[in-house]
Amino acid sequence: MPLIVLKDIRKSYTMGDGKIEILHGINLSIDKGEFVALMGPSGSGKSTMMNILGCLDKPTAGTYILDGEDTGNLTDSQLARIRNRKIGFVFQSFNLLPKTSALENVELPLIYAGIPNPERRLRAMEALKLVGLHDRMYHEPTQLSGGQQQRVAIARGIVNRAPILMAD
């Protein structure tokens, strides 16, 4: 069974009196373990598609089935739960909390998932070690280079061991 199935996904926005259709009937199936890249010129709908795939936005029409569950009728809190358990995110701007250590930044998704502190701390430390930052885990983002901040964001994206990792 595919991990992600999109059927006739459409997304449009109303701007003034007009309607702008960004996504036009997208069909897609992604199996667990598959690596997929969305490519296209600026303004082609990549970010819109990523927001839908990441359950950050809903399509205007069509069906999105994530791990066997139709996301179309889910509430915002149900979508948040799915994001926390099934999707790891690495944002282009990293979205690190400025006055928080690398370790605490990586722990955030685990806090939302209700993972108790001893396990949470250990998993965050393991994720930072995987990205080569075990020696910088107590540094705040301003004390890290851009590349190190990016690796903190990657560690935060993988710490929940979600089946999907989305990177922008």
Which role fits each region the language model picked out?
Residues 2-167:
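ABC family nucleotide-binding domain
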